[in-house]
Design a protein with these regions (language model features):
Chain A
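Acidic, low-complexity mobile loops and tails
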Residues: 1-57, 97-98, 102-112, 118-136
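Short, well-structured beta-strand-loop connectors
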Residues: 50-64, 75, 80-83
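Mid-chain, well-packed structural core segment of small domains
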Residues: 67-102
Length: 136, 370
């Protein structure tokens, strides 16, 4: 679905900090939402955790930066990083071009997904949250 | 309620807006990176109508300014624009500004929006009776046209021969039919102009809007995001971030604005004392190997704390993090290696004297066949 020009795919899980998560087999792929990317305007630098690094739900796992601003990325779930999107080192603009596709950040092997997924939003929940945010 | 410029009607429909110095201004229209590179490779336009513009006129105008700023004023010919500083009694920088000399006793003083009120108070406090200092900010608009394509973009709108208007010269002319003051100045490091459109108020913005829209046919509208990244890449300090009333011109690496041997201006006695010894810190540039430095980040030298970042960004030309900072004497030599602390880890960086780009390829001195 789409809220005021911001794309929100139906099949992802979301946080109120504007990250998305998607189950890909045993791993969970993580990125930032279209809204987050557009608010940053032009992503020029990505600092992601290393492979095998541990991430913890709702704790900072890296930063995404535009020319003007720094945005923390909070882990939507806990686990161990199994893959990092290295293409972003040379092409950080992929986050703006394709936040849910080529602009993904990391893949994590989850340690507590069944419990933690309860605190994530579905597309409708995130859309409703975004709408209240944009009304302010 | 924030104030708006005469061109707000254009920005509000097309730009992401931000509040700056009490004005609602465009932050970007498309992306900061694209607008930045449009100025480096072609031409861009900026609404800078928020900047303060004061007319200083009358028999005592030259004498007044001569005693106010460290630059020589009387010897400047009419038609000259010059960069200078307002200093307090301690030699600290109240603001940096451009003075355009229109006639022997007639000047337009262009100052930072955030300091306009303080500047006016400082000027009034030092002005002799009978001198007119008139705030023209609300009755004029101001548009910067910047980049290697600036001449051709602006020349379409005016009979003034822009090829004959040298850098830091100004002339009154009609632009898109409107009376204006055109100066070959700017804040991007590129060739370009600043056009002050007379007779433009919020109630009657049409003339200024016509100038802007005609320029937008051949130049890319740019927001404050690109204005900041461009000035930083050129190494120009921003007052309020890179210098303030506690910084003197020697520390800010702006001692060149002090005319040789000039005395008797506000702050001169304090500067004579501080100029006799090397400053304990000096403004420099940093280029990082990785990461983006930001305002307030700590700089470490071999012997520990060496200074602090006062503004930082990602350079679209270098594709690296760059910063302006103040460094202690031992670490300030260009070519020195230092560390910038970014979220707890030290990132290696090289000390430079900006501009950050290669002047053979970018900026107003660039080789024309590029």
């Amino acid at each position: 679905m789409e809220i005021k020009g911001y794309h929100i795919p139906d099949d992802l899980m979301y946080t109120k900090e504007h990250e998305w998560a998607k189950e890909e087999g045993k791993a969970v792929r993580i990125g930032i939402t279209d809204y987050a990317a557009k608010t940053l305007n032009d992503v020029v630098y990505v600092s992601a955790p290393k492979v095998n690094g541990a991430v913890e739900q709702a704790k900072s796992m890296g930063t995404v930066e535009s020319i003007k601003a720094v945005s923390e990325v909070y882990a939507p779930i806990s686990g161990r990083v199994v893959k990092v999107n290295g293409v972003l080192d040379s092409h950080p603009e992929l986050i703006n071009k394709s936040p849910y596709g080529e602009g993904w950040l990391v893949e994590v092997e989850p340690s507590n997904l069944p419990a933690e997924r309860k605190s994530l939003l579905d597309a409708r929940g995130y859309a409703a949250y975004l709408e209240t945010l944009l009304q302010k | 309620m924030p104030k708006t410029t005469q061109l707000f009607g254009y920005h509000s429909k097309r730009a992401k807006l931000t509040e700056f110095a009490g004005y609602e201004m465009p932050l970007w229209y498309t992306t900061t990176a694209a607008e930045h590179m449009a100025v480096r490779n072609a031409s861009g336009i900026f609404d800078v109508s928020h900047m303060g513009r004061f007319r200083v006129e009358g028999q005592k105008a030259t004498g007044f300014l001569e005693e106010l700023v460290p630059t020589a004023v009387k010897t400047q010919p009419p038609g000259k624009a010059f960069y200078t500083l307002l200093l307090n009694d301690r030699g600290g920088i109240i603001d940096d500004l451009i003075i355009e000399k229109l006639g022997e006793e007639s000047y337009l003083v262009v100052v930072n929006a955030a300091n306009a009120k303080a500047d006016m108070e400082h000027m009034r406090a030092h002005s002799p009776s009978g001198l007119v200092i008139d705030d023209r900010t609300g009755s004029t608009a101001m548009v910067a046209v910047q980049g290697p394509g600036a001449v051709s973009s602006l020349q379409r709108l005016t009979d003034l021969d822009l090829g004959q208007l040298k850098r830091f010269r100004c002339a009154e002319a009609r632009v898109a039919g409107e009376e204006a003051l055109v100066s070959r100045t700017g804040y991007t490091g590129e060739d370009g102009f600043e056009v002050i459109v007379y007779g433009a108020t919020s109630e009657r913005p049409d003339g200024a809007m016509k100038v802007w829209e005609k320029l937008a046919e051949t130049s890319t509208p740019c927001g404050l995001g690109a204005r900041d990244s461009l000035r930083l890449e050129a190494g120009f300090p921003l007052h309020g971030s890179d210098m303030d009333q506690g910084t003197n011109p020697y520390e800010a690496d702006l001692a060149w604005v002090i005319a040789a041997g000039k005395r008797g201006f506000v702050g001169s006695e304090a500067l004579e004392a501080s100029g006799a010894q090397p400053p304990s810190k000096v403004r420099r540039g940093l280029v990082l190997d990785f990461g983006i430095p930001r305002h307030g980040f700590e700089v470490l030298g071999d012997a520990g704390a060496a200074g602090v970042v006062t503004s930082g960004t990602f350079s679209p030309v270098l594709r690296k993090g760059i910063a302006l900072c103040y460094l202690a004497q031992g670490s300030s030599e260009p070519g020195s290696r230092v560390g910038v602390t970014i979220r707890g880890s030290s990132q290696p960086a090289s000390v430079t004297k900006p501009p950050f780009y290669d002047e053979r390829s970018y900026g107003w001195k660039r080789q024309k066949d590029n």
